[in-house]
Amino acid sequence: MSGMILDELSWRGLIAQSTDLDTLAAEAQRGPMTVYAGFDPTAPSLHAGHLVPLLTLRRFQRAGHRPIVLAGGATGMIGDPRDVGERSLNEADTVAEWTERIRGQLERFVDFDDSPMGAIVENNLEWTGSLSAIEFLRDIGKHFSVNVMLARDTIRRRLAGEGISYTEFSYLLLQANDYVELHRRHGCTLQIGGADQWGNIIAGVRLVRQKLGATVHALTVPLVTAADGTKFGKSTGGGSLWLDPQMTSPYAWYQYFVNTADADVIRYLRWFTFLSADELAELEQATAQRPQQRAAQRRLASELTVLVHGEAATAAVEHASRALFGRGELARLDEATLAAALRETTVAELKPGSPDGIVDLLVASGLSASKGAARRTIHEGGVSVNNIRVDNEEWVPQSSDFLHGRWLVLRRGKRSIAGVERIG
């Protein structure tokens, strides 16, 4: 059964590059493999872009293989070279704190138990932190050709521009050594990562062969992009879509995926969920025949919110999504969920002494361009407050109208939402 994992990855479109697939399939068929993926703590949280390699680890575990999640406590202090510009170096204490936070996130995606498939968490600072400069140059650097390293696309682009520091230039060597250490310690024979990591992973494959005489494998998954070319995983505010609920609320997370374009949603379902081929075919047919129902998008958002934030948070944000658009009770929403939902819209602050009539609130919240436009919308029956229609342009909110004593939900028409927050 364990060898079938490559067939699943293939039909899901999850193989971007690999070492010889026949050899890899034969090893997977012989019995459980140990597989790893690494994640550098360059921020306090992982983000949506990390999900594909993380979930691929989980697929391997479900197929009977043992996953290792590697937190880059050492490599995170350097940073993988980017196409443009040097990374800012973070303080060691900051990286250590982020490493622990990310370690906790990594542990949500694979199962830890005493079985042969029980996951392992490692931190590469354990073996890299004590590595002396002489050991690094003799035992690792000696195996790398500068000519080959200079031929890497990212390095060539950096050298053609502002250049690259020796620190970032050496990142590849440290990541390659991780593969050596994980093979020594755990018999790891497969590293997976994003397609942009191919050069680093292959360097590790070669270093294992040169230092240990062992054959190991590499497999990369596609980088996620939207069909229109926009970058995947950016929230409505332009920042990353973080897994930490304090950095990206469960509501914002859910809304990002429920708004996935029809052109992307089936591909995302293949990559981000464990739905079967038959279930995906049904959702693809529903999208083609009844796109307005957005069944595939709602399933994608639900699956991923449960995965990252749990069932209770998912139920809360699904109710919030319905309630904001008039299909549920706003009063049942807890304040944290309501506030997070409204902050994904425009929120007008209502301070003591500020104009608080409905016309002023519509303009302040951006739902109407002018007072005249606001009055017209009210007379046409297109304005509601807390899901109750307002047809009087002189309407002023009373204290009892504020949800949790603080919030109003304004809606113009069926889809345009804004919030009002009472301050002071």
Curated annotation (Swiss-Prot):
A motif ('HIGH' region) lies at residues 41-50. Belongs to the class-I aminoacyl-tRNA synthetase family. TyrS type 1 subfamily. Keywords: Aminoacyl-tRNA synthetase, ATP-binding, Cytoplasm, Ligase, Nucleotide-binding, Protein biosynthesis, RNA-binding. It comes from the Bacteria. SUPFAM superfamilies: Alpha-L RNA-binding motif, Nucleotidylyl transferase. It comes from Mycobacterium tuberculosis (strain ATCC 25618 / H37Rv). It catalyses: tRNA(Tyr) + L-tyrosine + ATP = L-tyrosyl-tRNA(Tyr) + AMP + diphosphate + H(+). Its main location: cytoplasm. The keyword Transferase does not apply. This is Tyrosine--tRNA ligase. It is an enzyme of class 6 (ligase). A motif ('KMSKS' region) lies at residues 231-235. Its EC number is 6.1.1.1. Homodimer. L-tyrosine binds at residues 36, 171, 175. PROSITE patterns: AA_TRNA_LIGASE_I (PS00178), S4 (PS50889). ATP binds at residue 234. HAMAP family: Tyr_tRNA_synth_type1.
